[in-house]
Structure formats: C-alpha cells, structure tokens
Amino acid sequence: MHIEDLVPQQISSRMSQVRAIKEVGGKIIRFIAQFEDFQKKLWLKRKFVVQADYCVTLDRVPEKLYDEICTNDTQRREWIRLFAIDKIEGLMGFGGYSEPLTVDFLKQNPKLVLDTAYFSDDFKHKLIASMENVDEDCSGLLINSENFQALRAIQSKYENTVSVHYIDPPFNLNSGADYSYRTDYKDSTWLTLLQNRLAECRPILKDSSLIFVRCDYHGNHFVRYVLESLGYQYQSEILVSRSRNEAGSSKMDVTHEFLYLYTFPGKDVDKYKVKRSIADIKWTGFLMAGDRNPPERTFLGKTITPPKGQHFSLIQEKVDRLLDENHLRLKCRNCGTLYYKSESTAELSRKMKKKGEAFKFYDIFATTKYEGVKDVSCGCNCGCNEFTVQYLGAPDEFINDNWLDISGYSRNWGFRTENSEELMERVLKFSQEGDCVIDYFGGSCSTLATAAKMNRKWVGVEMGEQFDKVDMPRMKSVLGGEQSGISSSYPQLKSGAFKYIRLEQYEDTLNNLIVNENSDIFDDDNNSFKESYMLGYMMDTETKGSLFNLEWFVNPFAMTLKTTKDNELVKTKVDMVETFNFLIGLNVDTIHWHEDDNICVVEGVTHKEEDKTLVIWRNCKKIDNEALNRFFEKMDYSTLAHDFDLIYVNGDNTLPNLRRDDDRWKVVLIEQEFQKRMFEED
C-alpha cells in the first residue's frame, strides 16, 4: 500500500482497533501475571513440617519407657525385618526373643533402633525431654520432600555449615528408561532443575566447601556451564567407573562417568589429603630409563643386571628394605612362579594371613605358585635362571583425577544407580570427622550411609516412596551397625540418633487453598475499581486465610492440613513447633512439655545471630495470659533478665517487654515472626 492510497477514515478505524487490542491485551497480560506471581509465591513459600520424628538406639532411651516399647507390635515387626530379632536366642533360656518382647531382651540388644513414629505423642515427648542437646545428639537429618522445598526449609538452620556437597542428579537421557525417577527432561528443563537447586543450596555451604556433581556424557557440558555460571571455580573432572554396559546397544560401551569437583573462587583442594588404599596398588616393573653405575642389584641372592639404557630405581640398601617388607618380588620368566623373601612358603602364608591388608598379592590365586625363600641364586625349580623384578607401590600414593580403580556403583540395596560406598568414602576423605555432608538427590542414601560410618554429620533429601522403601530402612540399618560396604574399615557405631522430617509440598499448598469471594464489596457503579481488583489483587486477597491464618495459633498443637497419601487427601497434623524452629534457624538444646501437654518449651541458640532463645508454645484455649504469667513464675523465667536474648510466645500476652540494643523487642509474637519468615524473599 502506498501513502497516497490511505484514506483518513480508514486510518482512524484501524487506530481504534489497535488501541482496543492494546487495552484488552494489557488486561489479559495483567490477569495472567497475577496468577503467575501467585504461583511463584506458593512455590517459594517455606513449607510446613507435617512430621518430625527420631530414630534412636535403645541405649539412649530411658529404661522407664521400656515397658511401652515391649508392647509395641509395629516396632517389633520392623526389628524382625531389619535386624532379624526373631533369630536371637538367649543364654540358658533367658533373654531371647519372645512375643511380647521383654525388658531383659531390650537391655541385651542396645543397638536396636527405635523409631518414635510408632509411639504415642506422650512417649515421644518423654524421650525428647531426656535429650540434653537435641540437635547435637542427632548425627543427621533425613528429609522426605521435593529437594527445592527442602533446601529452602533448612537454609536458616544450616547456613554456612556444609563442608562437602555431593549430588548424583538424574541423568538426562532424553528418553524414558527403567528407573524409579524421570530421565527424559528437555535440556532447558534439566538445566533449570539443576541450576535452581545448586543456587538454593549455596547459602548453606561453607566458603571452604567442596562441590561434587556426578553426571554422564549426556550432561557433562551442561554441568560445567551451570556450576561456572553460579560463580564456582573448576578444580577437576574426575573419571569414575560406570561398570554398567548397555545391553543391546550398537554404541561402543561406556565404561566411565564424570565427577566434577568445584570450589568457591580463590579456594584450592588439598590434593595431598586423600591417599589410595594399599589394596588399590598393583605390582609394577622396577626399571627406569637411563643408565646408573653400578647397574646391578642383588635380589634374594640373585644379582641382576638391567637391560642397556635402563636402571633399577633404588640403591641396594633400599632394595634390601623393600625385600624385607615384601614390596619387591621376583617372577620367573618361564613358569611365572613368584618369589618373596621368607624362610619358607609356610612362613610366608602365615605372614600374609596375619597382616591381612598390610600387602596385597594381586596375582596369587589357586593356579599361581609362590615360594617364600632367602636365596634364588640357583634359579627357579623349573630350571630357568631369569627373573623379572616387580615392585608393589607404597601405600601412600596420592590420588589424581582417575578413580577407575574403585567401583562407581553397587547393588546392595536394590537401586539401579546406587553409588558405591567405596566411591563415597574417597569423596568424604576430603573432609574431617564431624564435618557436615549434604546430598539432596538422595537415591539409595549411599552418601549418607558412608558419612555416618565415617563419623560425619549429614543431611539428605529424597521424595516419594523411595524414602520409606529404601532410605529409611538403610539408615536405620547403618545406625544399628550393619556391616556392608566400607563398614569393616571403620569402628562400629556404638550408639546414636538421627532425625527425619516430612514437608508439606507445593501440591499440598494448592489443595489447601480456599477461595473466599468478595463480590459484595463492590458498588454497582464502581466498575473501574472492580476491574482493577479482579486483574491485580483477587488471588492474594481471596486466598489470604489459606496461606496464613491467625486461628492456627490459638491451639497450634491441633493445626492440620490436607495432604496426599495413597492418592487420597487426608487430614494431617502439622508440627508447628518444628516448622518454627526451622524458620528461625534454631539449634535446639531442649524441648519439654508441661501442663498436660498444653505448653511446649523450646530452648536453643539461633544459628546465624547466636541469640540464646526461649520459645513458648501454648494452647491459648487452656492457657490464658494469667496462666502464662504463673507458668513464667513457676519456671523462674524473666523477660527482663539476661538469661535469654529472645523470647517468642504465641498469642497476645501481658509479659513485660524490653527493647534490645539492636532496637528490637525481646519478647516477640510467634505469629508475627512466623509470617515474616515463611514468606520472605531470599
């Protein structure tokens, strides 16, 4: 169309259409944006704890609770599954397995692991009250949740705590596969999944943390991109054994995968910290390039001259020492008989049996002949007089980026991609006893099991049925002293405890939304206000009571949500006490219940600010302000004293208050802090 063809009336009509489209389109965009912002708010909201329980060895349970344990049939049946207690026989007919269990039986089996979920609230309250330092007494935390929500839940409590980060996320195979998790993400979705969780985990890592991420060839280039986009510093691309070939595939078999090691900028890895076990060292040649004078060395009475242009790598004095230590041997070039320094074969056999892992004889099998001798100057029994010198490497070989000498997977717990404890042991050797380890793609819990055996603190996350079918049984077995994997290399756990929680999920949040229509607030003549409300404020306003409701705090011990169980919505009690502990980042020392369980008192120290904190939860229907004041007097609590830096109480109260040096009030309403922490942006 040319400009001379334009008619003024057409221009005016077309412009009116454009303005109408722009106006309607803008309203549609605003309406959609309202829903997207609301969805984001629901996703980022820190979720409620809907269950918090403890797994504890019996030696940590007060004996006054043993009678109730003996009558608990659910716990007894689990002990049969995990620890085969029905096979335990007593001495002289006393103390063996029976139904019901006896107190004597419990006393004789202190390593049995009790799960508080199988007992009454009263039992659990008494057990927790017996702990002098609740959080410190627990070696780990296991979370049943989608991992993004779990990472948000623990940020305040674990900030700057974790020393080793290890994840083995689902490999993006671009197709469905026989796994218990999804493997057919689009690349963009998989990248987003990985990036979000790595970013969400960052606040809980120490500046000195080591970040390990395992992947295969499908995602190695993506993993490096994501880690470096988050500001982490590349350290190494480690090869780990795959050990699982693809049956029926026309492709060349893939024998390795990648384990990426990153750190925070400016931090290095102590490469001398981790050494290979002597079991990983193989017999090798003892010759090196170049000449040396004199060239010959004597081995077991046999003087050997190296080929021209080569030399033996050590002087005679060190050769003799290595022969004494069985780190040198001779191998007959004809028949392959192996000769070690010893008085006799029998003596050598005893030495091998006694020292066990002191040296590893890789090629001594039933078909291999070996001799313990002092002298082979007359040659081998086969008549040959030529020998090869072999050297067993020193047990302090420092590792490099080739970890193919150990298995990458195992199949002990029926999980197809179960990381081997041997691999996890090497990863965790970069840390110290007592350091904290996290794995939020828990899988079969190999990371956590290994961490527990190596006396590390641990945090693990897994979702769905996997949590109950594999993770919980495995960690209970580890706590009870099971002996698979690396167990024989470390002292058996004498006693212990760990905590596990279940979180409300995003889908649960959606299922609990109640929309309260407010159509009666609009005047018939005020269409502009009504439209603005519908387009921009409706979702937040009409669902407000679903996301946060002051009624929950009247009796916080009776607060419930609808959650999904076995594909059905069921009413589930919310643990408001534990939810708040995580929201404020409270490292709990003690938890005690009073006044017929109508008051719960939590004492601890906030993780970040290190404020000594007292939290008082009450059933306001039973404990009014006068009763609360009497309770404070009874417990000798004072809001004006310096015993605590912060005191939280639910419900309006008449407690005296004090302004702190940082201009904050000492006594704070739980409702106020709860709402702020639950919905605050990062």
Predicted regions located by residue number:
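Conserved Rossmann-fold cofactor-binding substructure of NAD(P)-dependent oxidoreductases
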Residues: 152
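Conserved SAM-binding loop and adjacent beta-strand
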Residues: 411-423
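Conserved proline-anchored active-site loop of SAM-dependent methyltransferases
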Residues: 160-176, 227, 437-451, 580
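Accessory, often C-terminal, charged low-complexity segments
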Residues: 1-123, 139, 155-159, 163, ...
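Conserved P-loop NTPase mechanochemical-coupling segment
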Residues: 125-142
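Mobile active-site "lid"/loop adjacent to the S-adenosyl-L-methionine
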Residues: 163, 169-193, 197, 206-208, ...
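Conserved SAM-binding loop
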Residues: 143, 212-213, 440, 460
